[in-house]
């Protein structure tokens, strides 16, 4: 069944708060935020606001020097990992505004999606700061998304589901796009972040890793947003969650794991200390299992987290000695975890 985009002006709507739907509703398009159906969205909105940050807060002064000292393999990995993130945030900013939000008919969720789009744009600015601060290959990095065939092949697959929704906006394609967002936010991004943390663990590119920490904190809320939309739809539209669709979703996750494991090998070239091929693959499998279980789908791989130290590098939830500087920093403001929702 094809779904229409919501009206931007709809004074004849009589839809009550309890009648609101994730998609397929009939909203007035007024943001009456004194009436909330999806309380988790209101909580998430406030958390996203509390997490506000700016790229200029992060010092990149030492990264230019560090970059020059990286091995050839480390530089290649840095450039490739950064090029991947640049593409994904660019795609996601456009996808949210043009492709997802027009079909979502809950105003409190619309607000979260608009905020997420802003954060994706902020991340694009952060990457520009990183590129301009440390790399002599500015144009090369920004063109890599279509000139590097390994990356382009991956990007073609990532964009496929979103392009299908744009061409054929059915209920099933909207739902599959929500799952695709979960894969993007919860597997592809997380895998990319781990490379920067690996360098930082060796005392290299600490400003870049700090920037990634801020970005990852945002991505946690993005992942939770789509996770909760999917779970809310299970209650509203259980008829959409057919065995056939669930099998398709599992297939999407398996393909994502396969693609990301190959990409991880391509980034590291088997020459980055702390990131072997088996560790990369197991980490990606662990991420896939975690994302599936959060939306009521059985785990596929049954593996343990193989690089738990990554969590300590990305955590904002405790006061501890900052690994970037010899001082104690409190990052409690805006802290968020899956347990909060």
Swiss-Prot record:
NCBIfam families: PRK09614.1-3. Keywords: Deoxyribonucleotide synthesis, Iron, Metal-binding, Oxidoreductase. The active site is at 127. Fe cation 1 binds at residues 89, 120, 123. One of its GO terms (biological process) is deoxyribonucleotide biosynthetic process. SUPFAM superfamilies: Ferritin-like (SSF47240). This is Ribonucleoside-diphosphate reductase subunit beta. Fe cation 2 binds at residues 120, 185, 219, 222. It comes from Helicobacter pylori (strain ATCC 700392 / 26695). Its EC number is 1.17.4.1.
């Amino acid at each position: 069944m094809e779904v229409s985009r919501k009206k931007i002006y709809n004074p004849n709507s009589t839809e009550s708060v309890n009648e609101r739907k994730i998609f397929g509703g009939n909203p007035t398009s007024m943001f009456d935020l004194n009436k909330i159906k999806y309380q988790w969205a209101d909580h998430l909105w406030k958390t996203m606001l509390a997490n506000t940050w700016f790229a200029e807060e992060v010092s990149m002064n030492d990264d230019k020097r560090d970059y020059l000292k990286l091995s050839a393999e480390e530089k290649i990995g840095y450039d490739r990992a950064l090029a991947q993130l640049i593409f994904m945030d660019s795609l996601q900013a456009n996808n949210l505004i043009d492709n997802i939000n027009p079909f979502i008919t809950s105003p409190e969720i619309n607000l979260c999606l608009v905020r997420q789009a802003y954060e994706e744009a902020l991340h694009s600015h952060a990457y520009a700061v990183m590129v301009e601060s440390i790399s002599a290959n500015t144009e090369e990095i920004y063109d890599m998304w279509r000139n590097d065939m390994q990356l382009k092949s991956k990007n073609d697959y990532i964009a496929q589901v979103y392009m299908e929704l744009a061409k054929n906006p059915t209920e099933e394609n909207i739902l599959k796009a929500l799952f695709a967002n979960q894969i993007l936010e919860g597997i592809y991004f997380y895998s990319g972040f781990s490379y920067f943390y690996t360098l930082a663990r060796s005392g290299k590119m600490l400003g870049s890793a700090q920037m990634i920490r801020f970005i990852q904190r945002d991505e946690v809320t993005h992942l939770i947003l789509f996770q909760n939309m999917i779970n809310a739809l299970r209650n509203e539209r259980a008829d959409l969650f057919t065995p056939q669709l669930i099998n398709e979703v599992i297939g999407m996750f398996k393909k994502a794991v396969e693609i990301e494991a190959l990409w991880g090998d391509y980034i590291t070239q088997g020459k980055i200390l702390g990131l072997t091929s088996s560790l990369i693959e197991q980490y990606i499998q662990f991420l896939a299992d975690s994302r599936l279980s959060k939306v009521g789908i059985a785990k596929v791989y049954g593996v343990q987290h193989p690089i738990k130290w990554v969590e300590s590098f990305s955590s904002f939830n405790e006061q501890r000695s900052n690994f970037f500087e010899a001082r104690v920093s409190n990052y409690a403001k805006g802290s968020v975890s899956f347990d909060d929702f």
